[in-house]
Amino acid sequence: MRMRLMLLGGGNALGQALLRQGAEENIEFLAPMPPEQGWDPASLTALLDEQRPDALVNLAYYHDWFQARQVEAERLFAQEHAIDRLAELCLHHEIILLQPSSYKVFDGARATAYSEKDEVRPLSLRAQALWRFEQQVRTICPRHVLLRFGWLLDESPGGRMDRLLQWAESGEPLYLADDRRGNPTPVDDAARVILSVLKQLDCNAPLWGTYHYGGIEAATSLAMGQATLIEARRHRAEIPQDFTPQAHIERPDAPEEPQHAVLSCKKILNTFGIKPRAWRATLPAIIDRYYRHH
């Protein structure tokens, strides 16, 4: 790797997976510790004026964007200011900016897979913010890659998987939608994709733009939950019961969560040669890490 790489957010689950996989291939990232209050315009300016990497992976707000149950509007507003400044700095210092986004920018009203050309219609406050973050990067920093991921799965406390497993161990009745579909995407796989993109950008390939990636095969949230419990019982045999099917419309998060969230991954395959991997193959490693830390 000729490019000097910087990673914001090396402490979260996706950042850790990226650092692990990079180390296996002797690819190093500058991974600065965030200030106590998190990255803001002033601290980003000081950092990039001094360091000036060739490419920057922005995972600074990963937990808020992809794992937290709720995010306060004030936090998203502050992040918007930070991303605006980050994009300006990347333009000024000629830094490639790679930033994740989400299936959540779509409303989930259509049953077929979403491509990068499909109309965006975010449902929730967080999804609307993610769309604005995308637009900031597109408008300000031409040398960018935006990666929209499917249902990101990791072992982090307070994340999607953690909530699911704590619920399963609580003994309460368990319900998941059997008519809500998406692409479960373990963080190990998402990290592989980010690394693959960086390697090709290192060869001076100007492949800027927006790309979709999700694990195969697409699944209902019920099927994903059941697969998770099968793996979890290898560590906690006493997990009492299985999930009961429920309609998407009856789920408490239905107003905010797209019912149909399957992403078409043809563009990333055709452009970068990145093939989707089976999420079920990587799920055991995440569950294993989860129970090692709990």
Predicted ranges, named:
Residues 193, 200-253:
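Mid/C-terminal beta-alpha module of Rossmann-like enzyme folds, strongest
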Residues 277-294:
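Amphipathic terminal alpha-helices
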Residues 84-121:
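Conserved Rossmann-fold NAD(P)-dependent oxidoreductase catalytic core, especially the SDR/UDP-sugar
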Residues 135-182, 187-189, 195-196:
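NAD(P)-dependent short-chain dehydrogenase/reductase
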Residues 76, 112-134, 154, 184-185, ...:
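Short-chain dehydrogenase/reductase
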Residues 8, 59, 97-103, 147-149:
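SDR active-site strand-loop-helix element
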Residues 36-82, 89:
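NAD(P)H-binding glycine-rich loop region in Rossmannoid oxidoreductase-like domains
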Residues 3-24:
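N-terminal Rossmann NAD(P)H-binding glycine-rich loop of SDR-like oxidoreductase domains
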